[in-house]
Every structure is written in C-alpha cells, then in structure tokens.
C-alpha cells in the first residue's frame, strides 16, 4: 500500500495478479483498477513511489512503470535491459528507485540475495520523470544494496555507496582543463589550419592512483550532450 497526500489517493498492489488498484484517501471509494498485469517477475518484489501526480513501480521485473495516480492510466515504461545476460533469471537488471529529485528519477541495481561473483556492469540510471526518457546511464559505475542506504542528493552532488568495492562516491559537475596544440610553423594566409587538443576532467577524484593508472594521459571529460541540468 502507498499513499499520496497531494493526490488524495492510496494504491494497493495485488501480487498474485501483478496489478494495481487506486482508492480515494478521503472516502475509500475505488477510483481505478485493476491495471494491466505487469511483467511476470514483479510477483517476487515490487515497490512503488508517488511523485508529481504519478505512481512509479519498480523491482525485480527490471522495468519502471509509470501511471497517472488519479486515473490509473499507464503513461510509460522503461526497461533496464541487461544485454550481456549477467542476471541469471532475466533479460533485465533488478532495478530500484533511489530517489526522485528535480524531475528526474535516479535508479540503482540491487538484489535481495546476490550471487557471487557479483554480476558485472550494474547500471546506475537517470530518467526524465515525466516522459521516461533516459537522461543518462552509467554501466558498471555503482551497484547498490537492498540492505544498506540508498543514494542521496544535495547541492547537485549525488552520493552513493558502491557495493562492488564498498567505497562511497560523490559525483557532480566538476572542473575541466582544455589543451590546444597549433602548428608551430608559419602558415600561408588563407590556408586551413588544424587545431588539436583535449578536454580532461580535473576533479579531485581523478588524482587517485587507481584512476591515474587507468588514465595516464588524463580522464576524458564528459561531453555536453551527455550532461543535463
């Protein structure tokens, strides 16, 4: 059961049929439901959260389903695909919502009783909460846990424990450095010139030995197209 004070709605999850129902928080009257059955693996673990007039469901099914909280209309779905079949029982990663902030959904992979060695390449995903469009996805950066804390965000800094190495990471926009190399010989007027250079990330974390060993020439900066406000 989940309740939304803002929408004056509470919802009920029918595990056996994998469907949702919506009821008035004021009168108890049934408003909508049942929804269309969700993916089969949802029978094991399905959670839900309200945000901005919408109900989001997530869990073992590896799919985020979004509904209108007041009418039950299904608005969109997002599949956290696992193209290399690291998960033994699904084509999707188990996916959990860490938090929703500023119109974006931040999601982790975690699992109740993980198999060791842990599946490789677990994604951390950011979605547009209105459209379900993928804002960014980082495969292998962070793996969450069902038993520890979720990720958190404040001052545009996302803090997350990574259960691959048990380090706590903080990610945000950081400083960068630009290098440009021009021809060191004279060029006739009107001739074309090729400038070469690089843009590197110079955030504090890039100075750690493990990072420097992997990127001896500097960590490439994230492109503008791969970032969002």
Describe the residue ranges of each PLM region.
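Secretory-pathway ectodomains
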Residues: 1-229
């Amino acid at each position: 059961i989940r309740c939304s004070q803002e929408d004056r709605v509470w919802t009920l999850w029918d595990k056996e049929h994998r469907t949702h129902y919506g009821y008035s928080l004021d009168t108890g009257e049934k408003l909508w439901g049942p929804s269309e059955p969700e993916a089969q693996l949802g029978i094991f673990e399905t959670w839900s959260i309200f945000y901005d007039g919408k109900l989001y469901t997530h869990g073992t099914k590896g799919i985020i389903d979004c509904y209108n909280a007041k009418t039950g209309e299904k608005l969109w779905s997002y599949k956290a695909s696992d193209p290399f079949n690291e998960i033994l029982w699904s084509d999707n990663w188990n996916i959990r919502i860490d938090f929703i902030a500023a119109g974006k959904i931040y999601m982790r992979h975690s699992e109740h009783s993980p198999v060791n060695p842990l599946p490789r390449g677990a994604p951390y995903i950011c979605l547009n909460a209105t459209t379900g469009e993928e804002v960014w996805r980082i495969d292998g950066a962070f793996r969450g846990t069902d038993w520890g804390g979720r990720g958190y965000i404040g001052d545009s800094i996302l803090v997350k424990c990574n259960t691959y190495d048990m380090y706590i990471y903080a990610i945000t926009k950081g400083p960068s450095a630009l290098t440009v190399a021009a021809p060191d010989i004279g060029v006739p007027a009107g001739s074309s010139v090729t400038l070469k250079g690089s843009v590197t990330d110079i955030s504090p974390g890039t100075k750690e030995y493990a990072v420097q060993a992997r990127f001896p020439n500097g960590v490439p900066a994230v492109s503008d197209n791969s970032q969002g406000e």
